[in-house]
Design a protein with these regions (language model features):
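Short catalytic/signature loops enriched in Gly
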Residues: 3-5, 18-24, 29, 238-323
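Helix-to-loop junction immediately C-terminal to a conserved catalytic motif
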Residues: 64
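Conserved ABC transporter NBD signature motif
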Residues: 72-80
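Conserved ABC ATPase "signature" region
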Residues: 80, 131-148, 201, 254-258
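Conserved ABC ATPase signature
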Residues: 153-157, 161
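A short, proline-enriched helix->beta-strand linker immediately N-terminal to the Walker B motif
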Residues: 172-176
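P-loop NTP-binding/switch modules centered on Walker-like glycine-rich loops
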Residues: 179, 183-187, 191-269
Length: 323
């Protein structure tokens, strides 16, 4: 019997309309998320990587209905949540949470840690009064913040500590899914591994599922079960972390992996330098979205969008090199 995915999206799209350049001219459209199909199983960590601006964060927010999808469907725990109303969406918030990228702007500077972490308990009618303080103190302890800091304000903490508070806020409702939106990119390198290891430990303790968003493949490699590579609003490759690192299929994935530093000086590898910048999401190229920068592009790549194909068991890509 096949397991029902905890999360499943089908042809999910999020397009943004921009202001008109002239009074009667057409409105440009940003194709931020452009036909995403993913599934996430209970207890799984899915890494989502790609360059800045490729649509990773928009995808995460669309899945959580923090922004409304343009088209496609979102199923969570077997339920279609694409168009559920506000009251039902509020209930779902307890099962789907997010850890934001910037620990400095994501915490309200006017609120104490008690309110930042605990207000969701009150809003969901889960706890009141002293019970909220007890639950928050316990959760802070699990993320490495002493309970004496309950009445402290965000400015009294370091960046790494603030992100731990953000993690506690996401965990306090005991969700099933947490979307980690570049959770360490704003932190010092010396702190990044600590936060990633904390998230891995909490995943085991609370039986969580993560979508781990990052622009750096090395950040998600060691904790993810599978990795999806995103480019210009589309997922262009998906595989287990081991398969992706050992045998990257798409030229863009090959370029990303070539940029990962090798610690062993005897193991040399050729760095693939991509030419130019990614095309504008307001005017994506025809055919394969990567063809303007691809050193292996063929004529068909410029005119036809490649299909999503399974090259090896559970290893998918969209590239004409494999059709």
């Amino acid at each position: 019997m096949n397991q029902i995915p905890l999360l499943q999206t089908k042809d999910l799209k999020k397009h943004f309309l921009l202001e008109r350049r002239t009074m009667f001219g057409p409105r440009d459209r940003v194709y931020a998320v452009d036909g995403i199909n993913i599934d996430l199983n209970l207890g799984e960590i899915l890494g989502l990587v790609g360059e800045s601006g490729c649509g990773k964060s928009t995808l995460g927010r669309t899945i959580l209905r923090l922004i409304e999808p343009t088209a496609g469907t979102i199923h969570f725990n077997g339920q279609d949540i694409t168009h559920v109303k506000r009251a039902e969406l509020k209930k779902l918030r307890s099962k789907m949470q997010i850890v934001f990228q910037d620990p400095y702007s994501s915490l309200n500077p006017r609120l104490t840690v008690l309110h930042i972490v605990g207000d969701a308990l009150k809003a969901q009618g889960i706890a009141q009064g002293s019970e909220i303080a007890d639950r928050v103190a316990d959760m802070l302890n699990k993320v490495g913040i002493h309970k004496e800091k309950l009445r402290a304000f965000p400015h009294e903490f370091s960046g790494g500590q603030r992100q731990r508070i953000g993690i506690a806020r996401a965990l306090i409702l005991q969700p099933k899914l947490i979307i980690c939106d570049e959770p360490v990119s704003a932190l010092d390198v010396s702190i990044q591994a600590q936060v990633i290891n904390l998230l891995a430990d909490l995943k085991t303790e609370f039986h969580l599922s993560y979508i781990m968003i990052a622009h750096d493949l090395s950040v998600v490699n060691h904790v993810s079960n599978r990795i999806a590579v995103m480019y210009l609003g589309k997922i262009i490759e998906l595989a287990t972390n081991r398969a992706l690192l050992a045998n990257p299929l798409h030229p863009y994935t090959q370029a990303l992996i070539s940029a990962i530093p090798v610690l062993d000086p005897d193991k040399k590898k050729k760095r693939i330098i991509l030419k130019g910048e990614p095309p504008s999401p307001t005017n994506p190229p025809g055919g394969c979205p990567f063809h303007p920068r691809c050193w292996r592009a063929m004529g068909i790549c410029k005119t036809d969008v490649p299909q999503w194909v399974e090259i090896e068991p559970n290893h998918y890509t969209m590239c004409y090199l494999y059709e």
